[in-house]
């Protein structure tokens, strides 16, 4: 299985202060081919015709406080790849995060 793991701020490192941010990523790497993307994700154009089987937005993605990162990602809803959101920190911008998950 090929997984695109989208996260933010290098939180998947085993040396990160809060290691649980990267626990899922580190376990997935043992079982699948995982492509890590860290940073803002604006368009699904690059993955439309790729061999990605699943897209996961990790815990670190949902620590961001910039509302722009929770906007609709261009073309992602048109791609027939399952998208998983690891919703995190619901006390901050919960409605924006829920809408992000619905739209994408």
Enumerate the language-model features and the residues they cover.
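Extended catalytic core of nucleotide-activated donor transferases of GT-like folds
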Residues: 4-104
């Amino acid at each position: 299985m090929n997984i695109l793991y989208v996260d933010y701020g290098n939180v998947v490192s085993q040396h990160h202060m809060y290691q649980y941010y990267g626990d899922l990523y580190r376990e997935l790497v043992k079982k699948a081919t995982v492509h890590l993307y860290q940073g803002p994700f604006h368009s699904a154009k690059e993955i439309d015709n790729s061999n990605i089987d699943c897209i996961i937005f990790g815990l670190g993605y949902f620590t961001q406080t910039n509302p722009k990162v929770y906007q609709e990602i261009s073309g992602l809803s048109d791609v027939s790849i399952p998208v998983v959101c690891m919703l995190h920190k619901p006390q901050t911008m919960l409605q924006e995060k829920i809408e992000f998950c619905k739209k994408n």
